[in-house]
A protein has these predicted regions:
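Walker A (P-loop) phosphate-binding loop of ABC-type ATPase nucleotide-binding domains
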Residues: 35-40
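Conserved ABC transporter NBD signature motif
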Residues: 57-68
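Helix-to-loop junction immediately C-terminal to a conserved catalytic motif
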Residues: 49
Length: 292
């Protein structure tokens, strides 16, 4: 089932939160949904999950509108860290069973297997768990739902490093992966970079880009060396930041480098470094680029 977002706009209290959003998701891929605070990520997720209706445009799964469509809504699962009043005193086991009742594809055996891996005692009440353990339970519910579209919104908040690493492993190896669309909305970009097949970057309510991770990582680099040589090399390129360290100049550039340019840079004793995804994200969404 493909998920398609077509020309979606949303206005809240006379403020346009999303403007003409277009994005496409295909099964078997893990998508990184990236954006600064207030960019519109949460609003977009709430639309996919049918928490609210679009003002303009459409969101469809397998060609069918999701909003108020029970058949399609069954295939979308939105996971985020929250305490629902009805679950605070429930045992974890009861929490899992209640989710299984409302999710046709939910795999309870898989859920309990995951809880064991996360070292969660399912006889404890959800409220007695630490924040990180609660996050692990919520992550378990998302993975075990086997929903065609599973959205994790900052689900690793509160998890310690080993638990986050285990979650990442399970995302990559999750059951029925080839038929699922997994969307990860996160600010921990450096840790999750290796998970993403494609990146969708939201900035100021618009889709800044949708590209494969490999394509995107070819898009930014730094050039370091003697100031005059750096300036000559980056002339007519999209330089978004210039930094000086003594006699050394470092330019951050958005664009692609061909083999001949790389060879020329080496001849000029210039140091070329690819930007990590987090650095690239910061650079692309920074409205105050310039000199340091």
């Amino acid at each position: 089932m493909n998920l398609n977002i077509d020309k979606v706009s949303v206005t809240i209290k006379n403020e346009e939160i999303l403007s003409d959003i277009n994005a496409n998701f295909t099964p078997g891929k893990i998508y990184g949904l990236l954006g600064r605070n207030g960019a519109g990520k949460t609003t977009l997720i709430s639309l996919i999950a049918s928490y609210r209706k679009v003002d303009q445009g459409s969101i469809t799964l397998d060609g069918k509108t999701i909003y108020e469509n029970d058949e399609m809504m069954q295939h979308v699962n939105f996971i985020y860290n929250t305490k629902e009043a009805s679950t605070e005193t429930d045992q974890v086991k009861e929490y899992v069973e209640s989710h299984a009742m409302f999710r046709n594809d939910f795999d309870q055996d898989y859920a309990y297997e995951l809880l064991k891996k996360f070292k969660i005692d399912d006889s404890k009440s959800f409220n007695d768990l630490s924040q990180g353990q609660q996050a692990a339970v919520n992550a378990t519910l998302g993975l075990a739902s086997l929903s065609k579209v599973t959205i994790f919104d900052e689900v690793t908040n509160g998890m310690d490093a080993p638990t986050r690493e285990l979650f990442y492993e399970e995302v990559l190896e999750t059951e029925d992966r080839e038929n699922r669309i997994i969307i990860l909305s996160t600010h921990i970009i450096s840790e999750m970079e290796h998970l993403f097949d494609e990146i969708i970057m939201i900035h100021e309510g618009k889709v800044l880009l949708q590209e494969t991770t490999n394509e995107l990582l070819e898009k930014g680099f730094t050039v370091a060396g003697k100031a005059e040589k750096v300036r000559d090399f980056t002339l007519n390129k999209n330089v978004i930041k210039v930094k000086f360290l003594g006699a050394l100049q470092i330019d951050t550039v958005i664009g692609y480098l061909g083999p001949e340019e790389l060879e020329f840079a080496e001849d000029q004793h210039l140091d070329i470094s690819r930007l990590a995804l987090q650095e690239l994200f910061i650079s692309l969404t920074n409205d105050e680029n310039g000199r340091d």
